[in-house]
């Protein structure tokens, strides 16, 4: 679920994203991300290039928290409101078994502002 924290279409746009994930080290996981979207250039055709940053807190089933930061690029189709993005995640700290966690991952995903649903594939390493 994506909730705009700023007026839609006004940049930088700040979004609150509720997550429901299946992650290898955490299992079934929920999370909350605050994402900032900034145009990275002019609209070309129907495509707006963007840069994204976010901070996320993942919560494992047992309540342990894992902190993550993301920086990447993407594009928004200004007609369909479909978004594609990619970037790097860094993991650092948390609570419980993740208190000393460090790691990284490359992520590729897509989302729709119409359906309010997104998909993310991430691959990397996490040590804790």
Segments predicted by a language model, with ranges:
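Beta-strand-enriched cores of mature, soluble protein domains
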Residues: 1-128
